[in-house]
């Protein structure tokens, strides 16, 4: 992770940065476990969990914000990004255990008590790593703040207490929005030593967008646990029973309808029910709210535009 400084021929300096190296982040995570976990069996299990990890989007969020706010210490942001991904991995494991989801993952094939202890070790190790990145104590306190907010959102989710669209959105802001906000805020704080309210605001909306994408994905996979528990924004829409397709889908997800026999039938019912259109509307509203909030970011225009492109990639 480094910077290239070039002249664009008009007397202006153009700053280019090499993208975050996900392979290096994964190796750094394994190094951290190897150096800090003494129990060999636990070490082997944690490293195997890390090897399964394929996405490093939270590390990217931290890195993009660090670079946008003129951070210059590549080793510091690499360590922070690795610590954040350890935290996210622990959160994924806890989430799978609590939801009884993602059964193909290696941690879901272990005794739940072993998997829970391993996830706790990962979470504790992540805090140790993040706390070691900088002398700023607030780096760790911000991590705890957003982790606690996300856990409260997860509590609402597990308790099945959200029943209206607005309650679901608030739950998503806490559960998913807090986890998206964490790396963005930490990246800025590591670069500047300051908390940025605008970054928190627009990151919450990014969290909503990500969760809606997960809900959309789950519609095509009946064994996806959130649909078995009937606790998603999509299911909240379907239970209004606006049409026969909605009723058919409710029965299908409850495994009481054998009329939907293949993916094409399922896609047809989803279109007819209106749930896909509904999720797209909610997602587009969140994207627009993100863009409006992002406009308030006080940053050099070149850096701001590059950050916007990076954050919107894949949305």
From Swiss-Prot:
Keywords: Cell membrane, Competence, Magnesium, Membrane, Metal-binding, Prenyltransferase, Transferase
One Gene Ontology cellular component annotation held by this UniProt entry: plasma membrane
Protein name as it appears in the record: Tryptophan prenyltransferase ComQ
E.C. no: 2.5.1.-
Cofactor note: Binds 2 Mg(2+) ions per subunit.
Catalyzed reactions per annotation: L-tryptophyl-[protein] + (2E,6E)-farnesyl diphosphate = (2S,3R)-3-farnesyl-2,3-dihydro-2,N(alpha)-cyclo-L-tryptophyl-[protein] + diphosphate
Names of the cofactor(s): Mg(2+)
Function: Part of a major quorum-sensing system that regulates the development of genetic competence. Involved in the maturation of the competence pheromone ComX. Acts by catalyzing the transfer of a farnesyl group on the ComX pheromone. In vitro, can also catalyze the farnesylation of single tryptophan and tryptophan derivatives.
UniProt record similarity statement: Belongs to the FPP/GGPP synthase family.
Annotated compartments: Cell membrane
GO biological process: one example: isoprenoid biosynthetic process
Gene label: comQ
GO terms of molecular function: metal ion binding; prenyltransferase activity
Binding positions for Mg(2+) 1 per the UniProt entry: 95, 99
Pfam families cross-referenced by the UniProt entry: polyprenyl_synt (PF00348)
Domain of life: Bacteria
Entry binding sites for Mg(2+) 2: 95, 99
């Amino acid at each position: 992770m480094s910077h290239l400084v070039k002249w664009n021929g008009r007397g202006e300096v153009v700053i280019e940065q090499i993208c975050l190296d996900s392979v290096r982040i994964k190796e750094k995570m394994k190094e951290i476990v190897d150096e800090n976990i003494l129990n060999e069996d636990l070490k082997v299990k944690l490293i195997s969990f890390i090897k399964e990890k394929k996405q490093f989007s939270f590390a990217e969020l931290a890195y993009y914000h660090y670079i946008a706010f003129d951070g210059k210490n590549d080793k510091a942001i690499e360590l922070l990004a690795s610590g954040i991904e350890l935290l996210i991995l622990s959160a994924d494991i806890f989430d799978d255990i609590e939801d009884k989801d993602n059964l193909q993952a290696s941690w879901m094939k272990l005794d739940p008590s072993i998997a829970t202890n391993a996830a706790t070790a990962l979470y504790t190790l992540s805090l140790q790593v993040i706390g070691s990145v900088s002398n700023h104590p607030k780096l760790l306190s911000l991590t705890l703040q957003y982790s606690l907010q996300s856990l409260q959102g997860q509590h609402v989710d597990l308790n099945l207490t959200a029943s209206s669209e607005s309650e679901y959105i608030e739950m998503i802001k806490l559960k998913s929005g807090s986890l998206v906000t964490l790396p963005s805020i930490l990246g800025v704080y590591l670069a500047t030593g300051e908390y940025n309210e605008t970054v928190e605001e627009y990151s919450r909306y990014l969290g909503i967008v990500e969760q809606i994408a997960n809900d959309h994905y789950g519609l095509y996979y009946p064994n996806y646990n959130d649909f078995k528990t009937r606790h998603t924004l999509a299911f909240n829409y379907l239970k209004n029973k606006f049409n026969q397709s909605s009723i058919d889908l409710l029965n299908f997800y409850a495994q009481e309808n054998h009329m939907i026999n293949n993916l094409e039938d399922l896609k047809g019912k989803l279109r007819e029910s209106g749930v896909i259109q509904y999720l797209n509307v909610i997602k587009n509203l969140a994207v627009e709210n993100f863009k409006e909030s992002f406009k308030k970011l006080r940053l050099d225009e070149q850096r701001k535009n590059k950050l916007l492109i990076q954050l919107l990639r894949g949305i």
